[in-house]
Amino acid sequence: MNGVLNSMRLHSSAWITALFAFALFAVVSFTNHILFRTYALDLGLYTNALYDYAHFRFADTSLFLPESKNLLADHFDLYLMLFSPLSWIFKSYTLLVVQCLAVIIGGFGIYFLLNENERTRPYRIWGMAMFYLFFGTLAALAYDYHSNVISAMAIPFFFLMVNRMAWGKAFALLVFMCFGKENVSLFLFFVSLGLFWKYFKVKESRKYILLFAVFSLLYFLFMVKWVMPTIAGEKDFVHFGKYPVLGGDMTAAIKFMIMHPFEFIRLLFVNHMPEDPTYNNEKVFFYLVLFVAGGWALFARPWYFLMILPIIIQKELTNQP
């Protein structure tokens, strides 16, 4: 308790910023929920799953699929089990409350990360406030819940622990983030590669970050090649069907990217669904918005581009835009 009070006294401006941010998030998120403007997939589905987990039952896919399977076969998300006891208190608002609080905590991660360096320390509050007011942050909270958001809010703390060479804490955060959803571990593989690039000249950092990359990749492969197909009773990871342009399964996707690298790059910029001309210029607009929203900084810190590469690929090549 004394530690919290000391933190509030030493970093009072950060706590005040976080308080105002939470009020804003609550107005956006809770108001939409009150007015029935929140989304059934995933918020409604996962709220139902919370109820099942809170009553010691496995959740299933019967709400959105004709064939009922364990919900973990769709996304291996362990956060819902962790948060399920809170549903006894917050009811249908549980995941919205958790998501808003997670973003607030993520803002503190940015604050303390900027506080580490004398050059960036004067901008710590500005960085925190910009994160809270960023349109992507507000959009994530507006009408839905995704466990990816919870995982992403641990990223600044992960960066902080890597910067401090606190490898045990960094690994604990890595494992926590992997528990959010199976595809988060693939993202963390690229995050680790980006950090490997950034800290390449530091031998100790290089060694541990490479281990983090290996762990993330093995976790991803273990989940999508064995655990989830086994739970689903399928031969392969079901969500690869959303990427027919890559071949429809992991092996075909990897082969396509290796054998046709220029075509793969081209598809990231053009409409890969020519039967629907609605999307003809959407990818170009996306990159323009990304550039204006801060993507220009990737030219100065290119390792961050490596980190977000799987997110761009997942967004641009799906047949469910």
Where are these regions (language model features)?
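Extracytosolic helix-loop segments that constitute the early lumenal/periplasmic catalytic or substrate-binding loops
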Residues: 27-30, 46-71, 78-79
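Loop-to-helix entry region of an early transmembrane alpha helix in multi-pass inner-membrane enzymes
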Residues: 81, 89-108, 125-128, 277-281
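Membrane-interface transmembrane helices that cradle and orient dolichyl/undecaprenyl
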Residues: 116-118, 150, 155-169, 196-203
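Short acidic/glycine- and proline-prone juxtamembrane loop motifs at membrane-interface regions
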Residues: 139-150
